[in-house]
Structure formats: structure tokens, C-alpha cells
Amino acid sequence: MTELELLQIEYEEDWWKQPLPLPPITWQFELGKDLVAPEQIPKLPTRMRQLHSWYKMQKGKLFGASYLDEDLHKGEGRVWVDFEHLYHFYQQVALDVSIMTLWTVMESHKCRRCGINNIGFLDPSTVHENTVNLPSTVDYLYKAFLSMQDKRSILLSYNCFYHHVLLDISLSDSRIEVSDSRKRPLSLIQPVIDVLNKAFPKYRKKRKIHRPFWGDFTVEEAKYILKQPPGNDHCGFYVMHYMHCYTGDCRSAEMNTELDSGELLIGELVALQEELAGWLVDYVVKPGSEYSII
């Protein structure tokens, strides 16, 4: 019997809320030391190798990136990332919310540069399982909805129960589409649906939108998406991929609607790593660059 099967027996219906049983990482994190085993460094793609070289010259425990109001619709600010979370990114294991926030800011930046004006983004560091019950979260969502009222899709990378999912929020259609690489029950994300439904009527009232029988958001599962197989913790990378399906080229099961499966290939996963690493090198860690705090 596998560890996953034992987990399902022990926790029954609540097994979805538990971290996945995974093999231990052989190369452990130590601040200031390599993020991957030394023999793997020459095999890293160019941009990941450049970012790794920059990391080795740093003395602190974390690094920061700035963001603009038009990125996350919460004013200008900064996101801070522990180097241990950068290590997890290099090791292709569970990604911290701070890494997902960097990816979100990168996607927002790309949309502005490429003239993609119908997609907006919410802040994963503001809306997650530990904040959904805060009045400040409702206020943030309400103001963000007003700021993005003309967007076709508002994307949120949401983290709960050790897992990331992507929410595509449509204000005009009163609809939320959920892309979950593990196809978990929608009830697990009900808290974030509830807080979105609290902000939605405030937005409609402010906009003076009156439509008969228009109540809460309708929530649907995305049908034809790549799925995460057992044995890895790549859910964050799947959310990165799903965002790419909105903002750029990607391989999706939607290309063949007869498919309801297919997983993220290792080459595609490395390409996601390389893209974020390249953006960090060009726009964050370089002094004086657009998202640098130096």
C-alpha cells in the first residue's frame, strides 16, 4: 500500500487537506550555499545560472522586489522572498506564496509591455487561506474590482491546504472558473469564494449595476487543463502554466478537447523556472531596474 493510500485511509474525506507524501530532498538548504548540488550548477539553464550566481554574492536571508499599483491594484509596495523559498523554486518543490506573487507581478508586467489590456491580477500575498476572513481583504477586493471593472479576466493564484489553484474571475459574467491541477473538491476553496461574494455586491452597488436575480458568483471547474500526477508537489508550477494560457503561448489540453488529462512536462517546468529567473535578473536584482528596490 502506498503512502498516498495510507493517507486517504487515515484522513478519509479530509485527506485532501493534508500535505502530499513526498520523498525527501537530497540536497538540503543552507543559507549562502548552493541552491542545487554543485554538479547540477553547470546543467542549469542560462538565466537560472545567472540568478544563482547573484544569490551566491548576497549576505542577507531574503531579497525584495517592488511592484506598481497597476500590477496588484493595492498601491505601490514590495514583496519579500526568503532565499529558502528561492531554493524550493530551484528544487521544483512546494512554492511559497511569495514566489507566486513574483510570478503574478511578472505576468502583469508582461501584459503591459505586450499591450494585453483585458487581464488583471490580484495579490496572492493578500488573498490566501489565512486572510480570507479579514475585513481588510474584502476592502482590498472591492477596490480592486473597481480598478479592474473593464477586465475580461481577473486572475488570482490562491493557496490553501498546501496547494495552489488559479481563479479566473469574470465580473461581467458573475463567474469564477477554478483551475486545480489535482481536481480537488470545490468545497475546499469555499472560504475564498465567500470573501469574493462579500466584495461583489459592494462593487455592484458602487457601479450602480442592477440586474434581476444577479447574486453570488457562479463557480465552475476548468475542464480541459493539465493535471498534476501523484508523487510531486508541482501545483505552483501548474498555476504558472495556467496563467500562461491567458497571457501567452502554452501547451494546454484545451488544444484537444478530447483530452481531460496530460501533465506538465519537465521541459515545460524548467522553461517556467527559466522565465521567472530571467525576469528577476533583468527587472529585479539589477540595480536601478524597473522592479528593483535598490
Predicted regions and their residues:
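Enzymes acting in ubiquitin/UBL processing and closely related pathways
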Residues: 1-294
